[in-house]
Amino acid sequence: MLKYFGTDGVRGVANQGLTPEMAFKLGRDGGYVLTKNKKDGEQAKVLVSRDTRISGQMLEYALISGLLSVGIEVLEVGVITTPGLSYLVRAQGADAGVQISASHNPVEDNGIKFFGSDGLKLSDEMEEEIEKLIDAKGDNLPRPSAEGLGTVTDFHEGSAKYLQFIENTIPEDLDGIKVVIDGANGASSALISRLFADCGVDFTTIYTHPNGLNINDHCGATHTENLQKEVVKQGAQLGLAFDGDADRCIAVDENGNEVDGDHIMYVIGSYLAEHGRLKKDTIVTTVMSNLGFTKALEKEGLKNVRTQVGDRYVSEEMRAHGYNLGGEQSGHVIMSDYHNTGDGMLTGLHLMLVMKKTGKSLSELLKDFKDYPQGLVNVPVKDKKSWKEHQPILDVIAEVEKDMNGNGRVLVRPSGTQDLLRVMAEGPTQEETDAYVDRIVKVVEKEMGK
């Protein structure tokens, strides 16, 4: 198990867990690992960007210093979305990219996320190689001087290139649909108006005035309450909410109901399939997707492949088997015909495109999708990793699954950050689902509860 890297890079409380010293080490060691195979005489090129957090520049300057110290040329993009950076790495032929962001997390947190030359997140093996250098007793990496040092070049024009790329994926103006857009006071805030205006959208924005401290503050993809109210108040047909780095999109229908990533993928996937454009008639999701998603797809003659939690694993599955649509319930949606990572603004525009092409409201497009009631209990345990070694727990899960008779599912998994075992079930009614969860929780508490 990795020490510093989680499912989405290195994260922590800025200036405490994630310090400038750590950012320098990540720049130096990460930069070396990502560019060490360059031929002699070729200077490596790395793009660096950030979201709108007050700690972003502090960490950015430290990280860039680390990159420069191993002779890397840095293109400083400024504030841009994470998918924007991913696109620019590929478009500019860079060796790597680094985004400084903690996505949907609160302002006190920040993170450092690396991308390879393909614009994709790093493999576990590469992250492990970086961690070994961070923890090494000495520093034996190159220390060039004079002309061997790296330089920094301003590349703020990258934003315009990225917006043009997204606009080019939309074949016609998206007029006729009134939309309210929540920018989470994050990285998309300065981009939304430029992009959606160029796509002919009738829109208003909320939470697009970042001040360094208000990112994700009761707004964005994880707090849609105010967007839901605003959609109804304005009589809009749609609401779109992005998170701090805009790799997620959560929607709101014309009635003010939240529409998560499962529902967005169902709408886009069904439309693509109807037009023969959904590869292998399959959508890739994680184990967290609601059983109702799979059932709705089955009615359409479509399939659902599931991976472990994390959009990187969805992306890996899509590339390995040639699928072109996947994502997470949380709003990461990957449309690989256009982009190789989740992109909130791209997703929102393509959801609008389906609405315009079909002439249907979002609630109409979702009328055949019925979520299964879900029950979830977090059980404090002594050793979360050992739960599969307890036969009584495995037995009760098997018994519950047998009783469900294909009309429900169980998911038991350890928390990634706390000493908890998450026990989740879905079933035909809330009462039955809660009873299933309770049966399993009682055995877990008896076997390994604190």
Swiss-Prot record:
GO terms for molecular function: magnesium ion binding; phosphoglucosamine mutase activity; phosphomannomutase activity. GO terms for cellular component: cytosol. Keywords: Isomerase, Magnesium, Metal-binding, Phosphoprotein. Activated by phosphorylation. This is Phosphoglucosamine mutase. One of its GO terms (biological process) is UDP-N-acetylglucosamine biosynthetic process. The keyword Metal-binding applies. Catalyzes the conversion of glucosamine-6-phosphate to glucosamine-1-phosphate. Pfam families: PGM_PMM_I, PGM_PMM_II, PGM_PMM_III, PGM_PMM_IV. PANTHER family: PHOSPHOGLUCOMUTASE (ALPHA-D-GLUCOSE-1,6-BISPHOSPHATE-DEPENDENT) (PTHR42946:SF1), PHOSPHOHEXOSE MUTASE (PTHR42946). Its cofactor is Mg(2+). NCBIfam families: glmM (TIGR01455).
